[in-house]
């Protein structure tokens, strides 16, 4: 048997090319999650990711036409570049921040050029990697809860804006050190970041929640005690049923019963002195006509935002007082970027996703992005955008065979090999 070595060489280069592309996108994904191992280069991780993606083209075979197949990316890339330049201008960014824009654009351009059949493979890679690093974090966190002594060091981030006890596999915010059961945040700066990132990965994993990696992610969400993550998780449960055109009524009886039992039990158990009641339910109580947990902005900022809406700064935004802690969400984004920034953001999202193959997947992705924007305001963060973008182009599984994990991988691999 004669083996054509030239074909083997092309296949190896193709595999290396796609592998480096995935590695660069994985690095971009974590660049906005700020895991502590990347703190030494915080603010430059996206630049490194963009450089890695450019480096991949050294290994690109001349006849490669199966991974970067899309040519309808120009409008979305131009809108993103415009949005980035605009945000830097209104934010009075320094020269270094402007110099990083081309590398950010490279990340989005590569993502938008990926063939739609390759997106499931990318998401499988990111999801499993997240589960692999979350698993030991959860294990050692549970040991910590039970009082096992673990090595640690003190740590701070963002010019000592955050202070942590770093147990290497997980961080404990110093504000939670006295809690009997602190909120789980894995390697990241906030429990909310960890919980929401896992929820958006689960959002893409429609119909596959019984897989080991999704069980790990679900456990991480529950341990985060993030109200935003919990609300998004419930929304994802219903969206998954809607995307698959399943009947709602019978499917929601069991989860509603479980949620109702947990809520009722939390008020009765130990006279309400328990984790579920103190960390979640008490934040859903209505105080002065508003939900207690709706604390994304302070009262001072709320008054300032009302004055802003009546000012001449409404179009291009105004500089915010950064000394005040605890403000985030859509109001902060509009305050800082103005309604011009909001328009550019919406236009970018629409341009990036409007060619989705399934209307329900597209609407679900837009809804998830909107809900996160209301709460956190930063929907161009890669841990939010990449799963949302891929989910918009996903096809809901219609048969058990289509729900198998390997199908998307096998299709992509076969197309690469040919």
Language-model segments: which ranges?
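Alpha-helical transmembrane segments of multi-pass inner-membrane proteins
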Residues: 124-148, 172-225, 230-242
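TM-adjacent membrane-interface loops and short helices in multi-pass inner/ER membrane proteins
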Residues: 289-325, 339-343
């Amino acid at each position: 048997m004669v083996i054509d070595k030239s074909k083997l060489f092309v296949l190896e280069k193709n595999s290396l090319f796609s592998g480096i592309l995935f590695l660069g996108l994985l690095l971009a994904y974590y660049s906005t999650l700020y895991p502590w191992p990347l703190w030494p280069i915080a603010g430059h991780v996206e630049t490194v990711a963009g450089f890695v993606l450019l480096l991949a083209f050294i290994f690109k075979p001349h006849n490669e036409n199966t991974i970067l197949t899309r040519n309808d990316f120009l409008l979305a890339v131009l809108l993103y570049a415009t949005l980035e330049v605009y945000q830097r201008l209104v934010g009075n960014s320094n020269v270094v921040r402007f110099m990083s824009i081309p590398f950010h654009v490279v990340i989005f351009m590569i993502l938008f050029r990926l063939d739609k059949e390759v997106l499931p493979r990318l998401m499988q890679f990111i999801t499993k990697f997240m589960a692999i690093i979350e698993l030991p974090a959860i294990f050692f966190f549970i040991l910590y809860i039970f009082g096992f002594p673990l090595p640690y060091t003190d740590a701070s981030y963002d010019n000592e804006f955050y202070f942590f006890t770093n147990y290497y596999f997980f961080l404990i915010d110093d504000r939670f050190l006295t809690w009997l059961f602190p909120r789980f945040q894995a390697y990241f700066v906030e429990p909310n970041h960890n919980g929401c990132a896992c929820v958006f990965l689960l959002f893409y994993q429609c119909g596959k929640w019984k897989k080991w990696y999704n069980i790990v992610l679900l456990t991480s969400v529950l341990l985060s005690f993030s109200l935003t993550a919990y609300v998004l998780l419930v929304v994802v449960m219903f969206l998954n049923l809607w995307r698959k055109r399943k009947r709602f009524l019978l499917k929601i009886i069991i989860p509603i019963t479980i949620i109702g039992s947990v809520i009722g039990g939390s008020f009765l158990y130990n006279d309400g002195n328990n984790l579920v009641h103190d960390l979640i339910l008490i934040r859903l109580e209505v105080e002065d006509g508003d939900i207690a947990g709706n604390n994304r902005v302070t009262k001072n900022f709320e008054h300032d935002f009302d004055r802003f809406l009546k000012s001449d700064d409404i179009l291009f935004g105004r500089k915010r007082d950064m000394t005040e802690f605890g403000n985030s969400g859509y109001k902060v984004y509009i305050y800082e970027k103005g309604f011009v920034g909001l328009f550019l953001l919406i236009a970018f999202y629409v341009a990036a996703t409007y060619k989705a193959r399934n209307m329900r997947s597209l609407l679900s992705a837009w809804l998830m992005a909107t809900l996160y924007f209301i709460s956190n305001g930063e929907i161009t963060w890669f841990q939010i955008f990449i799963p949302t973008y891929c989910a918009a182009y996903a096809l809901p599984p219609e048969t058990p065979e289509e729900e198998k994990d390997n199908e998307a991988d096998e299709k992509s691999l076969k197309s690469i090999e040919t």
